[in-house]
Amino acid sequence: MYPAHLLVLLAVCVSLLGAASIPPQPLNLVQFSYLIQCANHGSRATWHYTDYGCYCGSGGSGTPVDELDRCCQTHDNCYGEAEKKGCYPKMSAYDYYCGGDGPYCRNIRKECQRFVCDCDAIAAKCFARAPYNDANWDIDTETRCQ
């Protein structure tokens, strides 16, 4: 084998190892973002909800700062209930559709998928109804979420 071929083979192997170490985005979180966009008709980008209040985003504690933050707290609690049932809410893929009045779960026979889809659809509709207060985005959770 020629040295150039070995270099190409080595480069391919290294790049494959690097790609394997990148964790995949949990499918459910991608679907949840689509449900949010469906519910609010694209009026607010999904990333606005990732660091809002005390509960929107990763984790959560304290008293929710407003109605939207309560939607996130309820969604977190719903995922907690799903986990108690032995479900993996961040990994449960499901079938849904986007109707004129928001997202709906459809054709779901597996209990975990149905439960998680309902959690997400209810939360997405709650997000769409709740006012968004820019002052509650990226807050200091150490002081405001006690």
Swiss-Prot record:
Any one biological process term the GO annotation gives: phospholipid metabolic process
Signal among keywords: yes
Cofactor: how and how many bound: Binds 1 Ca(2+) ion.
Residue positions of the active site: H75, D120
Cofactor names: Ca(2+)
Domain of life: Eukaryota
SS bonds (residue pairs): C38-C98, C54-C145, C56-C72, C71-C126, C78-C119, C87-C112, C105-C117
Compartments it resides in: Secreted
CDD domains given in the database record: PLA2c
Proregion positions: 20-27
Cellular component terms (Gene Ontology): extracellular region
GO molecular function: calcium ion binding; calcium-dependent phospholipase A2 activity; phospholipid binding; toxin activity
Tissue: Expressed by the venom gland.
Chief localization: secreted
SUPFAM superfamilies named in the record: Phospholipase A2, PLA2
UniProt EC number: 3.1.1.4
Catalytic activity: a 1,2-diacyl-sn-glycero-3-phosphocholine + H2O = a 1-acyl-sn-glycero-3-phosphocholine + a fatty acid + H(+)
Job description of the protein: Snake venom phospholipase A2 (PLA2) that inhibits collagen-induced platelet aggregation. PLA2 catalyzes the calcium-dependent hydrolysis of the 2-acyl groups in 3-sn-phosphoglycerides.
Family designation: Belongs to the phospholipase A2 family. Group I subfamily. D49 sub-subfamily.
Protein's UniProt name: Acidic phospholipase A2 S8-51
Species: Austrelaps superbus (Lowland copperhead snake)
